[in-house]
Regions:
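Sec-dependent N-terminal signal peptides
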Residues: 4-15
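Extended lipid/amphipathic-ligand handling interfaces
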Residues: 29, 57-61, 188-193
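Short hydrophobic/aromatic-rich beta-strand segments that constitute the beta-sheet cores
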Residues: 40, 67-71, 89-93, 99-101, ...
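N-terminal, post-signal-peptide region of Sec/Tat-exported proteins
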Residues: 40-76, 168
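Solvent-exposed coil/turn segments that connect beta secondary-structure elements
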Residues: 45, 62-64, 72-74, 87-88, ...
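Generic beta-strand structural signal
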Residues: 61-62, 83-85, 92, 135-138, ...
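Gly/Pro-enriched, hydrophobic low-complexity segments
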Residues: 122, 141-234
Length: 243
């Protein structure tokens, strides 16, 4: 009996019937940076063995289904804008004055040459709807193991999502291919208070199959429930707005 108790204390606990709790945790993580609506200023730093580049962006969100991100610098990329409405996504390139709709097959493609995908940027994939969830917990963290449902088209065979319990904050996501090989990691860093909410102020995306590559998004400012964000902020007309 004593030996059994020691084993239970030393190893994480797989919580039976915990899918609803896992869904609630994932939903809370996905709402961290959004709220009902939000405005955000971000810097994205892309590093490769050959070069490094930095982009500054302004973004707005409305609920889970609306998002727009506009590059404000450097000058050569200024005005490039990405719009997401429901499951549709468009990019606007002001230099050629052209709107290009992103097909579903390209959602896992790189956004602006970074290690983040189009899907990462606009969060089109709904984890709680498209993945089966298994919750493992210990005294300090939740580990949620996500595997795609039978009818889900996914680049990932599995996602391990590690979340700190107190305060409830994301720590890391590990992405595996269909063969069980870990191919990238998303690490959350440097928690700060924005609009009264504590959340990570930086996210590092590390592609493990591309040595020397790293993309970091820094959140410079976040405002929740800002005035002026409405349905019309996410129109195709707004997408083509020049700055």
């Amino acid at each position: 009996m004593r030996k059994t108790l020691i084993l239970l204390l030393c190893f994480p606990l797989v919580v039976n019937g915990s899918e609803n709790q896992a869904k609630a945790i994932i939903n809370e993580m996905e709402e961290l940076y959004r709220g009902t609506s939000s405005e955000v200023l971000m810097t994205m730093q892309v590093e490769t063995p050959q070069y490094s580049r930095s982009l500054r962006m302004f973004g707005q969100t409305l609920g889970k289904e609306r998002a727009i991100f506009r590059i404000t610098s450097p000058k050569k990329d200024k005005g490039i804008t990405t719009l997401r409405r429901d499951k549709e996504m468009w990019n606007f390139f002001p230099k050629i004055n052209k709107v290009i709709k992103v097909p579903p097959s390209m959602m896992m493609g790189s956004w602006m040459g970074s290690d983040f995908t189009n899907d990462d940027l606009v969060q089109e994939t709904k984890l709680v709807e498209e993945y089966n969830l298994e919750l493992i917990t210990d005294s300090e963290t939740f580990l949620i193991i996500l595997t795609p449902k039978e009818d889900t088209v996914s680049l990932w065979g599995k996602i391990d999502y590690l979340i700190q319990k107190d305060p409830l904050l994301p720590l890391k996501q590990s992405f595996f291919d269909d063969y069980g090989t870990k191919v990238r990691e998303l690490i959350y860093k440097d928690p700060k208070v924005f609009g009264g909410k504590l959340l990570p102020s930086a996210m590092e995306m590390i592609p493990l199959n591309k040595p020397g590559h790293l993309t970091t998004i820094f959140y410079n400012q976040i405002e929740f429930g800002p005035e002026g964000v409405s349905e019309k902020s996410f129109s195709l007309r707004e997408l083509k707005k020049r700055i």
